Amino acid sequence: MTEIEEIKRQVVKQALELEPGGFRPTNSLTESWIGRVYLYKENERIPLDKNGEQMIPLLQLCIDNLPLIPKALSKTKVITVFIASELPFEITPNGKEWILREYTESDELVIKDLKNPSSLLKAFPLKPKIIKEDYPVFDGGGLANELEERILELEESGVIDDYGELLDNVYGHKLGGYPSFCQP
């Protein structure tokens, strides 16, 4: 095994890419969406932000029918995410400018056709696709310092031209793998 293959073996992760649109939605209890949420508990509605305005339905992620489920979500059935129309400048806790709701198998969910008329998001169903190999972006975390240094040495010695040719990060909506869009 070459040194490059060994580095890849150490950091590779599987992930699930969530591709928006391009197929007919089913509107079922197992369909994930971006820009739409229609699964709620009987007593739930679209949450309100600090100004009393309806939040924007951002994501509905149905876990139980996915072909790859991270261990941390093994007991989760559905996750829904809502955001305020006025996004915060600083990180705020769940429930202030955004709300993440997590449902388990014991939660009874119903389909509700609730919409926020002021949302500018176009809703698309999400189709899961397994990513067999996902790697971290070079300066985005995920690589141990000694691996970063070794990759830089391989670049300087001419063994590789660039980190990007060695390890490829899959960008887009995904579950698992490595983050693609990081800010310090």
What does each model-identified segment do?
Residues 1-184:
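Preference for intrinsically disordered or flexible, low-complexity segments
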